[in-house]
Swiss-Prot record:
Domain of life: Eukaryota
Gene: ptf1
Keyword Signal: no
Keywords: Chromatin regulator, Cytoplasm, DNA damage, Hydrolase, Magnesium, Metal-binding, Nucleus
Quaternary assembly: Component of the mst2 complex composed of at least eaf6, mst2, nto1, pdp3, ptf1, ptf2 and tfg3.
GO terms, biological process: chromatin organization; DNA damage response; L-serine biosynthetic process
EC number: 3.1.3.50
Sites where the protein binds Mg(2+): 12, 14, 176
Function, as annotated: Component of the mst2 complex which is a highly specific H3 lysine 14 (H3K14) acetyltransferase that functions together with gcn5 to regulate global levels of H3K14 acetylation (H3K14ac), critical for DNA damage checkpoint activation. May also function as a sugar alcohol (polyol) phosphatase that prevents accumulation of toxic levels of polyol phosphates, which can impair glycolysis by inhibiting glucose-6-phosphate isomerase.
Cofactors required: Mg(2+)
Keyword Kinase: no
UniProt record similarity statement: Belongs to the HAD-like hydrolase superfamily.
Location of the protein in the cell: Cytoplasm; Nucleus
Name of the protein described by the UniProt record: Pdp3-interacting factor 1
Length: 229
């Protein structure tokens, strides 16, 4: 009897797992402001600027120390309440969850720690950019790779997609915005958050997707797609 394929859930973090995008929150409130950020996002969608360059402009406009930025995010950025039960269900079903983020790992783990607890926050799989904190408390992003995305999420997914059919897992991706463009075509099923830029991109490029509002929606859809008898 053939062994049942494992399911891998790849997910963006900011704006997908979180209710607010942490990088957008910093940029809008302590940097260039909402209008300028939205304009840069539109330029990324249009292809007139790379995500890497746009993101650098956004973060460079934020004048907070690392500690200040971390405290601001912990006070103001919440995680989708349905993510914790979703994640616990995934673990119970041997579903591998991998966070693919264009954000920065120290911020991500700190937010997870508030909502999942220290043990889960330290063990959850995260592939993301990092942070270099300077002696004076200032900080800068350290990109994951040299791509024009800064973190090309497709590079993590593709090796699994290229496995022989018998060894290839089922794969889904969950995302919301311009940082997810590189991953949008890489999995067999895509979940795109309602009202966000990723849907605009998918509609323009004719990429099929399922719309979601919370991880409760994704939970239900995964049960129908992969666990219905």
């Amino acid at each position: 009897m053939a062994q049942k394929k494992q399911l891998y859930v790849f997910s963006d973090f900011d704006g997908t797992i979180t209710l607010q995008d942490s990088n957008d929150y910093l940029t809008d409130n302590f940097g260039m402001g909402n209008a300028n950020r939205v304009n840069l996002n539109q330029q990324v969608l249009d292809g007139s600027i790379s995500f890497r360059d746009a993101f650098a402009k956004m973060l460079d406009s934020v004048h907070l120390s690392y500690d200040e930025a971390l405290e601001v995010l912990k006070k103001n950025v919440a995680i989708d309440p349905s993510f914790k039960p979703f994640y616990e269900w995934c673990k119970s079903q041997d579903i591998r969850v991998i966070i693919l983020s264009s954000g920065m790992e120290p911020f991500i783990r700190a937010l997870f720690e508030q909502y999942l607890g220290k043990e889960e926050a330290s063990s959850i799989e995260i592939v993301s950019n990092d942070i270099n904190v300077h002696p004076d408390g200032q900080w800068n992003i350290v990109y994951h790779d040299d791509s024009h995305f800064g973190h090309d999420k497709s590079l993590t997914i593709r090796p699994y997609a290229q496995l022989p059919e018998s060894k290839r897992p089922h794969m889904v991706y969950c995302g919301d915005g311009v940082s997810d463009l590189s991953a949008a075509k890489e999995t067999e099923h895509l979940f795109a958050k309602k009202g966000r830029d990723l849907i605009k991109y998918c509609e323009r490029e004719k990429i099929s997707f399922s719309e979601f509002e919370t991880f409760a929606d994704i939970h239900k859809d995964l049960q129908k797609l992969f666990f219905s008898s």
